[in-house]
């Protein structure tokens, strides 16, 4: 029997991450586009020859694919657990049964100071984080004494759906 999803949230990267990635992709493609005459004001090369940047294109394709697959954090709360999944393909997943949760609360924290940034991170102080942007999170106090921060735009909306200890 499948547990019913009681709450679901998708949190994507900040706008500036998208802008930086777009800039890098365009900067990498610019030389070839110029050689083909696809940039206004630059004359087409008489002999563009074979694509000299094939390894670069391959690298860009892999980066764009990786970015597309890993572009968001999905948080789901079911009747029995919290489920985390990274990306559209949900290749990286984590399940936290309510029986392993001792407490849950919404917090404001410093991702840079506490974890060195965003993403899936670990701290030497027994804390870990799954975040994509911002400084708001659902903090889960786990039975083993560790804490898990789950990035959220509005973590206070998640708290009522969590039943610590499986109650």
Regions found by a protein language model. Give the residues of each.
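Transmembrane alpha-helices and immediately adjacent membrane-cytoplasm interface residues
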Residues: 56-72
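ATP/adenylate-binding site constellation spanning eukaryotic-like Ser/Thr protein kinases
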Residues: 79, 98, 155
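Non-transmembrane, membrane-adjacent beta-strand/coil modules in membrane-associated proteins
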Residues: 84-149
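Interfacial helix-start motif at the membrane-water boundary
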Residues: 49-57
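N-terminal membrane-targeting/pre-transmembrane regions
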Residues: 1-49, 129-130, 142, 147
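Membrane-helix interface/capping segments
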Residues: 71-87
